[in-house]
C-alpha cells in the first residue's frame, strides 16, 4: 500500500488491513454519496467474502478491481487452503466473484495482493489512469 501511494500521490487510497473496521466503514459511508470506490484485496476465501460484503453494502458505488481468474492464476501463492477455509467459499455467491471462486475451488491455493503490486499501477489500468489525472 505504501509503495502505491508514494508512487501515485494524486490517487486517493484507503488501506483497511483485512476485515474492514468500523472507522473504515464509517469513512466509506460518509464518502459514498459523492464518490465511487475501487476495491482490491486478497484472493483467498476471506478476501472474497470481504469483497462480497463491501459490494453488498456499497452497491454500484463499489467496483471490484480485477477479480478475474487470470489474475488469480497469475499470482497463485504456495499457500494451500485448509478444508476449513475452503468451506467458506460456499458463502460466496456474488456473480463478479464466481470466476475466481471456481478456480480457487480447483486449485485450493490463495493469491495475495502484495504479489499483484506490479499490476496495480495506473498506467496499466486505464480506469485508474482516468481517476488519477
Regions found by a protein language model. Name each.
Residues 47-50, 74:
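Switch/connector loops and helix/strand junctions flanking conserved nucleotide-binding motifs
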Residues 57-63:
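Structural alpha-beta junctions
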Residues 66-82:
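Short, flexible loop segments at boundaries between secondary-structure elements
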Residues 79-133:
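Long, charged alpha-helical interface segments
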Amino acid at each position: 500500500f505504501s509503495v502505491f501511494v508514494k508512487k501515485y500521490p494524486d490517487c486517493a487510497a484507503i488501506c483497511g488491513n483485512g476485515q474492514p473496521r468500523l472507522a473504515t466503514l464509517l469513512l466509506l459511508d460518509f464518502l459514498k454519496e459523492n464518490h465511487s470506490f475501487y476495491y482490491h484485496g486478497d484472493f483467498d476465501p476471506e478476501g472474497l467474502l470481504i469483497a462480497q460484503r463491501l459490494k453488498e453494502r456499497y452497491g454500484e458505488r463499489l467496483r471490484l478491481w480485477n477479480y478475474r481468474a487470470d489474475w488469480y492464476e497469475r499470482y497463485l501463492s504456495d499457500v494451500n487452503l485448509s478444508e476449513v477455509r475452503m468451506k467458506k467459499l460456499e458463502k460466496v455467491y456474488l456473480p463478479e466473484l464466481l470466476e475466481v471462486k471456481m478456480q480457487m475451488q480447483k486449485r485450493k491455493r490463495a493469491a495475495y495482493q502484495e504479489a499483484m503490486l506490479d499490476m496495480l499501477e495506473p498506467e496499466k489500468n486505464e480506469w485508474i489512469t482516468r481517476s488519477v489525472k
